Structure formats: structure tokens, C-alpha cells
Amino acid sequence: MRYLQKGQSVARTGEEPYSIAMMLKDILPAPYTFKITASDISLKSLMVGQKGFYPESRIGGIPEKYLERFFTKTNGGYQANSEIMDTIHFDYHNLMHDSGLRNLDIIFCRNVLIYFDEAAQLSVINRFWNSLGPKAYLFIGHSESLFGMNTKFEFLKTDWACLYQKNL
């Protein structure tokens, strides 16, 4: 069995980790498995994600094939099923402290760094570096950049993401 360990930096109310999990379930062939750690500083947001229930108004961009496979339509919304919920662990975490996670393959931290000053950003980025395994990836938001920061990450040019790779 091959295992992909994926770190999700910001859970919010779970939409992003569930979306990533659905895509991975769709594209990863057997024998690959994965586990997502979805973290946030808001306990209220984490509770929404753990429940896995979303009103129809929040389901907008999910492809029909994913809704049919990973959700059950209920009165007023959709409930994530165990196939997808079992891939995600929701955890309270403040990015200003070390998570203790190591050898992650991917970290998604979109639209969070913009809320920190440069010193705090660098501190968070260094913690991400320590959490990632060799040749692992860091995705950040389009409005964010590591440009001009003294980091060891290598920018990978793509048309679709702000992507960095950990190089040793």
C-alpha cells in the first residue's frame, strides 16, 4: 500500500479539505491511500467540518459525480459520507506554533499568510518547511508570495497555482 500524507493548514469549515479529498479519491489509483489533517484556530469552524453537513447554498461548485459518490442529499442540504469523512482529521492548531506533523507530502495554506506581518509569515513558512518531507509541496494563495523572503523553497511556475517545492 502506498500512502500519501497530506497536510491541510487551514480547515475553515471544511469545504477545501473535502474538495481535495474528493479529487484525490477520484484520481489516485489503488493501492494509494491518503490522510488529510485539516487544522484551524476556530473551534466553531472545525465543528462544522467534522459534521460534514452543508446546506445546498454551500455546495455550488461541486461536480455532480462527486455529490453522488461522496454525499447523501438530506432535507436542506448534503451530508458527507464515511468514505470521504474518514480521510480527514480535523484538528485545532495555531499556525504560530509547531504542529508536530512531519514528512507531509503537501501543505495547502491559501489566503492565510496575508493576515500576518512579514516576520510572522517567515516564522510560519519555516514551520511548514520543518513539517514537509523531501521534495514536498507548499500551495499558497494567489495573493501571497514568498518572493523576497529568505526561504529554502523553490518556486515552481504554473498557470494554475502558487506552488513551491521543498528542496534540500
PLM regions with names:
Residues 2-14, 35-37:
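Conserved class I S-adenosyl-L-methionine
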Residues 13-30:
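Conserved SAM-binding loop of SAM-dependent methyltransferases across substrates and taxa
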Residues 22-26, 51, 130:
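Short, well-ordered alpha-helices that flank and scaffold nucleotide-derived cofactor binding pockets
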Residues 29, 54, 133:
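Short conserved AdoMet
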Residues 32-108, 112-115, 120-123, 146-147:
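Extended basic-aromatic, gly/pro-enriched interface segments that bind polyanionic ligands
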Residues 106, 149-168:
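Core SAM-dependent methyltransferase catalytic element
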Residues 122-134:
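A short glycine-rich, Lys/Arg-flanked "PGG" loop and its adjoining helix->strand segment in the class I
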Residues 134-142:
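Conserved beta-strand signature within the Rossmann-like core of class I S-adenosyl-L-methionine
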